[in-house]
């Protein structure tokens, strides 16, 4: 294993994610909770041959998300706010225990909204849980939600953006010009 051979684990930053409802191919799309976190974290630690993860991210909120070009269909009007806040409490409580155990160093979010991010911050503050340090959301010239949705939260709450899809899934690369769709492309 590359990591073990180097013998310099502290010189490397490892980030990984636990995926929830956004991906049906992993744990059948079960929501993120203490059981799915425990399962995913244990497997990640074993697979990566390490005893801790520097940044452990929650990939896709359990309540859904408008990210990855789902903004036209996203409708939060049927969300149960009390259930969502309890869900965030349970997740942060469990992740904070994993931080205390030394298995996780930092907590991050992925494909989260400004409201969701603020709930993580508020609940962490109210309960002395570990704080979210980063958010990994889509960001490109074609997808600027971060600028109008999260930049202010990130600045004032000291949460770093780890952007993904800077070429908008290839749309900005030029390979889809003139209506052409290359074979085996993502779109």
Residues covered by each model-derived region:
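Short acidic capping loops at alpha-helix termini that bridge into adjacent secondary structure
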Residues: 9-12, 51-55, 105-106, 130-134
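A short, structured active-site edge motif that brings together acidic residues
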Residues: 10-23, 135-139
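Active-site mouth loops of central-metabolism enzymes
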Residues: 22-38, 77-86
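Specific alpha-helical transmembrane segments that line the substrate/conduction pathway
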Residues: 30, 58-59
């Amino acid at each position: 294993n590359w990591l073990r051979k180097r013998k310099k684990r502290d010189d490397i930053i490892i980030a990984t994610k636990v995926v929830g409802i956004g991906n049906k191919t992993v744990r059948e799309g079960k929501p993120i909770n203490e059981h799915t976190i425990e399962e995913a974290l244990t497997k990640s630690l074993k697979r990566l041959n390490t005893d801790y993860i520097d940044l452990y991210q929650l990939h896709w909120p359990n309540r859904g998300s408008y990210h990855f070009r789902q903004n036209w269909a996203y409708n939060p009007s049927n969300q149960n706010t009390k259930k969502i806040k309890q869900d965030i409490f349970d997740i942060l409580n469990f992740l904070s225990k994993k931080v205390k155990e030394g298995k996780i160093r930092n907590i991050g979010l992925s494909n989260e909204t400004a409201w969701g991010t603020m709930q993580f911050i508020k609940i962490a503050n109210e309960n002395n849980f570990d704080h979210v340090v980063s958010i990994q959301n889509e960001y490109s010239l074609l997808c600027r939600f971060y600028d109008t949705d999260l930049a202010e939260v990130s600045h004032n709450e000291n949460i770093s953006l780890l952007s993904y899809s800077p070429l908008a899934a290839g749309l900005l690369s030029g390979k889809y010009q003139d209506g052409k769709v290359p074979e085996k492309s993502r779109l």
